[in-house]
Amino acid sequence: MEQYAANSNSSAEQIVVQAGQIQQQQQGGVTAVQLQTEAQVASASGQQVQTLQVVQGQPLMVQVSGGQLITSTGQPIMVQAVPGGQGQTIMQVPVSGTQGLQQIQLVPPGQIQIQGGQAVQVQGQQGQTQQIIIQQPQTAVTAGQTQTQQQIAVQGQQVAQTAEGQTIVYQPVNADGTILQQGMITIPAASLAGAQIVQTGANTNTTSSGQGTVTVTLPVAGNVVNSGGMVMMVPGAGSVPAIQRIPLPGAEMLEEEPLYVNAKQYHRILKRRQARAKLEAEGKIPKERRKYLHESRHRHAMARKRGEGGRFFSPKEKDSPHMQDPNQADEEAMTQIIRVS
């Protein structure tokens, strides 16, 4: 398991993942982090050396692989791992434009680590569902708002969230590049006034706060490629965030609004459908319907005058003065005025 910690001037971010892909959503842009720990290089001193690939701008892409660290200026920077306490491995990366260093800590599976007031607990063996718990017992004040204790439990290795209210989307990837699971939950921590728990790994995810309970359902499948919708929770008028469902490409669109009929019409429609299906199976009628039966009748119907809703006028209604065309009535009135004058 790997841990990515980015220290800035105002606050610290901590991301705990296993080899896969993490997408972190921020206010100004999107930060995508991809970790691959299979390729490692051993230095002359016997320490493990791992490199990063950084592309500046928005979105900011960080890729950990067996290559090298490429900054916005195009200059490669080698990052060397330093062994820490309790069998941990710490890598420090200089960041241009900010004060401080970015630290990447490698934690063996099944080990508990406590650092900077945050506890990271990893449970489960290989091939089983693992649980990652991120806790922040201390109180933080951001933009004049007091943020209380926040606890996040992630099951299924899919969704996580930082203490600043930023969302992390973890998508496991197969060897062939297909995504196993997909989903996203965005919950601004500043908009909630109490402890917050997000659990992922089942069909139903419950988010509880001090003001109420919001239930979110995420499509989660084991080894099946998921093409369902994406659920986003955005702050509403109150303290409880609202839920919006955005269909992803490939999701089935809803059918048109059904036509309402009475019981007699419904049974008659069923009988006609059964009779037509029987004739189509016997080959007596074609399966594709024509636009019209006779072309002459179609032209005649299109030439007839229609009323509101496309209804045809009856002969009596057509001859009545209040059913005439308004333009035609105005022309007749003008003709009478000219004759009188």
Swiss-Prot record:
UniProt motif Subunit association domain (SAD): location: 260-283
PROSITE patterns found in the cross-reference section: NFYA_HAP2_1 (PS00686), NFYA_HAP2_2 (PS51152)
Tagged with keyword Nucleotidyltransferase: no
Annotation: DNA-binding region: 290-315
Alphabetic keyword roster: Activator, Biological rhythms, DNA-binding, Nucleus, Phosphoprotein, Transcription, Transcription regulation
Keyword Phosphoprotein found: yes
UniProt-listed SMART domains: CBF
Renumbered residue ranges of the record's region Disordered: 294-341
Subcellular location: Nucleus
Composition bias, Basic and acidic residues: 305-322
Modified residues (Phosphoserine): 320
GO cellular component, one term: nucleus
Bias-annotated ranges (Basic residues): 294-304
Subcellular location, principal: nucleus
Listed GO biological process terms: positive regulation of DNA-templated transcription; regulation of DNA-templated transcription; regulation of transcription by RNA polymerase II; rhythmic process
MF terms (GO), sorted A to Z: DNA binding; DNA-binding transcription factor activity, RNA polymerase II-specific; RNA polymerase II cis-regulatory region sequence-specific DNA binding
Entry function: Component of the sequence-specific heterotrimeric transcription factor (NF-Y) which specifically recognizes a 5'-CCAAT-3' box motif found in the promoters of its target genes. NF-Y can function as both an activator and a repressor, depending on its interacting cofactors. NF-YA positively regulates the transcription of the core clock component BMAL1.
UniProt subunit comment: Heterotrimeric transcription factor composed of three components, NF-YA, NF-YB and NF-YC. NF-YB and NF-YC must interact and dimerize for NF-YA association and DNA binding. Interacts with SP1; the interaction is inhibited by glycosylation of SP1. Interacts (via N-terminus) with ZHX2 (via homeobox domain). Interacts with ZFX3. Interacts with ZHX1.
Family: Belongs to the NFYA/HAP2 subunit family.
Name the UniProt record assigns to this protein: Nuclear transcription factor Y subunit alpha
UniProt source species: Bos taurus
